[in-house]
């Protein structure tokens, strides 16, 4: 989910779901996933933070994220720092979203890339899944979710407050269900899971402990406690978009 921005098309498709943002019930990632980065706002938020969406380096010049994280042709900045502070190194590039984004409720095409002006050096890109490889996953399959989103949701008199700190976080969830475009991942703390929240949108959900990005974070429940809804990268439509920018497995 992008910073508390709810895409109307997603809301219609998923009813009560709201876009995802930050990792909850997780821990600081440190250097475990250096290929996961955050989109940095040109202006600071009122809480002193900067990052509004997450994503993954999938080639030296291509950064994978969600379409609802930007506008076609927009110039954006990306950090790969595990704990971002103003003035840290960023990489500049151009945002390109799937042109079919938002036109189909069953497959919203909520996928995008940032093409960097210069290749990112010293970071090994993540891998993508092969075609159709996620259709028959075991119910016990785990996913590693990574992102810069909200790390805690508090219930205040004025409503829920989402707390951010621009730190790359990681959590593990378990497969809940599979449909043609989505995976639903349990992030219920009572069963030992963690997951995503606002600000984690576009970030990766790695298959188990591998370097394969199975799906990207798109949405979930509004208080970031039960379900992480992620967009599959093994589908024909996702691969059709990605094939314009990277060589697919």
Walk through the language-model features, giving the residues of each.
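Secretory targeting and sorting signals
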Residues: 1-22
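Short, hydrophobic/aromatic-rich segments at coil-to-beta transitions
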Residues: 31-38, 181-184
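Conserved active-site regions of diverse hydrolases
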Residues: 46, 76-85, 101, 139, ...
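Chymotrypsin/trypsin-fold serine protease catalytic domain
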Residues: 108-193, 228, 235-243
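Acidic glycine-/aspartate-rich tracts in secreted/extracellular proteins
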Residues: 42-45, 68-72, 82-85, 116-122, ...
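Conserved catalytic-core segment of clan PA serine endopeptidases
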Residues: 23-32, 43, 71, 76-135, ...
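C-terminal subregion of chymotrypsin/trypsin-like serine protease catalytic domains
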Residues: 23, 29-35, 51-71, 77-78, ...
């Amino acid at each position: 989910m992008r910073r508390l921005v709810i895409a109307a098309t997603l809301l219609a498709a998923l009813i009560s779901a709201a876009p995802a943002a930050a990792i909850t019930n997780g821990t600081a990632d440190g250097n475990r996933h250096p290929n996961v980065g955050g989109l940095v706002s040109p202006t600071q938020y009122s809480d002193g933070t900067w990052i509004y969406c997450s994503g993954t380096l999938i080639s030296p010049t291509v950064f994978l994220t969600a379409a609802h994280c930007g506008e076609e042709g927009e110039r954006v900045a990306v950090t790969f720092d595990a704990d971002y502070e103003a003035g840290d190194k960023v990489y500049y590039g151009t945002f390109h979203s799937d042109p079919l984004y938002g036109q189909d409720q069953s497959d919203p095409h909520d996928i995008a890339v940032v093409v960097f002006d210069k290749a990112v050096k010293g970071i090994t890109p993540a891998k993508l899944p092969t075609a159709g490889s996620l259709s028959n996953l075991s119910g016990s399959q785990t996913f590693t979710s990574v992102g810069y989103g909200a790390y805690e949701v508090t219930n205040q008199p004025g409503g829920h407050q989402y707390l951010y700190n621009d730190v790359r976080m990681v959590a593990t969830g378990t497969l809940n269900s599979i449909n043609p475009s989505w995976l639903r991942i349990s992030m219920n703390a009572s069963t030992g899971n963690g997951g995503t929240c606002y600000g984690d949108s576009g970030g990766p959900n790695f298959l188990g402990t591998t370097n394969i990005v199975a799906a990207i974070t798109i949405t979930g429940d509004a208080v970031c406690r039960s379900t992480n809804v992620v967009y599959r990268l093994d589908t024909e439509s996702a691969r059709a978009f990605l094939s314009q920018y990277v060589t697919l497995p």
